[in-house]
C-alpha cells in the first residue's frame, strides 16, 4: 500500500476556527482522539524478522505477512500505536481485592434476584495496560523525485497482541527507544482522512512503555507555541497504478484548494520523514 499526504502548520489561535471549518466541509463533528505512540528501532539484520512469537500468532496473517515483507527490506524505526481515552491519563491501575474475587466466584452460575436492582458502579476509572490494544505501523522513507507535489511513501500496518508489547517487539529484532502521545481530531472527506493534531511529551523519560499514564495537565506540547499539524492522507491499495495515484493526488489538491484561505497544505520535507535506522 501507499500513503499520499499533505501537511500544514496551524497556529494555536486558529485551531478552533479551523475545527469549525472542517466540520462544515466534511458535514461531520470532529472525532477527538488520543493515541500512545511507541518508537522502536531495528537492531537485527534484514531477513531475520520472525512473525510467529507467542501470542502474536493471533495477529491477522495477511497483514503480518505484508508487514514482514516490508520490514525485511531494511532496518527501520517503526511505531506501535495504541488508542487511549482522556480518562486514562492519571487513572490508577486496576486492582482485584479479596471482596472482588469473592463476588466474582459467587456470581458464577448465580443470577441476580428478580426485582432487585443492581447499584450503579461508583468505582473510579482505571487504566489497564495489560488490556491495551496495539497496532504496528510501518512507514518507509518518502519516495524521491516524485513529479506530483504530494508526499508519497510505502506503508503497512498489522494488529498486535494486547498488553505488554516488549516481548514480541524484542523477538522481532526491535528495541524500545521512546514514546509520546498525540491528541487531535479526525474528519473524513470522501477518501481523505484529515487529522488536526499536536504531539504531547511526557514529563519524564522512560526506558520501557509506561504501565500508567500521567495526568493530562502534566503533558507538555512538543510545539511550545501551541501550534497544531494538519495532516491530510489517502491510502492507495495499488501504488503501482499510476492512474490511481494520480486520482488520489488530485483529491488532495482539491482539498488544498478548498482550504487555501485558511491554511497552506504542502508536501513535507522528505528527510524529515526518514524512518531508516542508521
Swiss-Prot record:
UniProt-listed GO biological process terms: regulation of transcription by RNA polymerase II; termination of RNA polymerase II transcription
Cellular component terms (Gene Ontology): core mediator complex; mediator complex
GO molecular function terms listed in the Swiss-Prot or TrEMBL record: transcription coregulator activity
Keyword vocabulary terms for this entry: Activator, Nucleus, Transcription, Transcription regulation
Superkingdom assignment: Eukaryota
UniProt cross-references to InterPro entries, sorted A to Z: Mediator_Med18 (IPR019095)
Reported function: Component of the Mediator complex, a coactivator involved in the regulated transcription of nearly all RNA polymerase II-dependent genes. Mediator functions as a bridge to convey information from gene-specific regulatory proteins to the basal RNA polymerase II transcription machinery. Mediator is recruited to promoters by direct interactions with regulatory proteins and serves as a scaffold for the assembly of a functional preinitiation complex with RNA polymerase II and the general transcription factors.
Assembly and interaction partners: Component of the Mediator complex.
Family per record: Belongs to the Mediator complex subunit 18 family.
Official protein name in the record: Mediator of RNA polymerase II transcription subunit 18
Species of provenance: Aspergillus clavatus (strain ATCC 1007 / CBS 513.65 / DSM 816 / NCTC 3887 / NRRL 1 / QM 1276 / 107)
Amino acid at each position: 500500500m501507499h500513503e499520499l499526504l499533505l501537511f500544514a502548520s496551524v497556529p494555536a489561535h486558529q485551531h478552533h476556527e479551523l475545527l469549525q471549518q472542517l466540520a462544515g466541509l466534511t458535514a461531520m463533528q470532529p472525532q477527538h482522539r488520543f493515541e500512545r505512540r511507541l518508537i522502536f528501532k531495528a537492531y537485527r539484520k534484514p531477513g531475520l524478522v520472525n512473525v510467529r512469537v507467542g501470542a502474536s500468532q493471533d495477529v491477522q496473517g495477511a497483514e503480518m505477512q505484508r508487514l514482514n515483507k516490508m520490514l525485511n527490506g531494511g532496518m527501520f524505526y517503526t511505531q506501535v500505536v495504541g488508542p487511549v481515552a482522556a480518562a486514562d491519563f492519571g487513572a490508577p491501575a486496576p486492582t482485584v481485592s479479596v471482596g472482588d474475587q469473592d463476588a466474582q466466584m459467587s456470581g458464577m452460575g448465580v443470577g441476580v434476584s428478580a426485582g432487585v436492582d443492581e447499584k450503579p458502579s461508583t468505582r473510579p476509572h482505571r487504566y489497564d495496560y495489560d488490556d491495551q490494544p496495539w497496532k504496528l505501523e510501518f512507514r518507509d522513507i518518502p519516495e524521491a523525485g516524485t513529479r506530483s507535489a504530494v508526499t508519497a511513501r510505502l506503508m503497512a500496518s498489522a494488529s498486535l497482541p494486547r498488553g505488554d508489547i516488549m516481548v514480541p517487539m524484542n523477538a522481532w529484532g526491535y528495541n524500545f527507544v521512546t514514546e509520546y502521545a498525540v491528541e487531535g481530531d479526525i474528519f473524513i472527506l470522501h477518501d481523505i482522512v484529515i487529522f488536526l493534531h499536536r504531539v504531547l511529551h511526557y514529563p519524564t523519560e522512560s526506558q520501557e512503555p509506561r504501565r500508567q499514564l500521567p495526568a493530562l495537565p502534566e503533558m507538555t506540547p512538543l510545539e511550545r507555541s501551541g501550534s497544531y499539524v494538519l495532516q491530510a492522507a489517502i491510502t492507495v491499495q495499488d501504488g503501482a497504478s499510476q492512474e490511481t495515484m494520480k486520482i488520489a493526488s488530485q483529491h488532495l489538491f482539491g482539498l488544498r484548494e478548498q482550504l487555501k484561505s485558511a491554511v497552506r497544505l504542502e508536501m513535507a520535507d522528505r528527510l524529515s520523514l526518514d524512518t531508516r535506522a542508521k
